[in-house]
């Protein structure tokens, strides 16, 4: 549902010409296909024994981390504790929440400077 809402918002509210929006749509579709190609990797995560999930993201990925956190909380009816934070903010206290039953997922950026923080944390 998040992807559909995001694509709809981009198509409706972005004043860019339709041809440019169409190209962007193709890029997003291609990225979505790559995610689906990783289904086996995702299944490995689901099979882990966890009761906490922490999503980390910076810049535009901060909102994505928040949305992902809400989805897990909603889909598990609160049975899985969730949190979201930026990678830099996570270092200052929240990382103490990690235990053996915690999965931490980082939405890494491609910005060289910020990516250093993402990789260092991982």
Task: Please place each PLM-identified region on the residue numbering.
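A SIS-like phosphosugar-recognition module
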Residues: 1-122
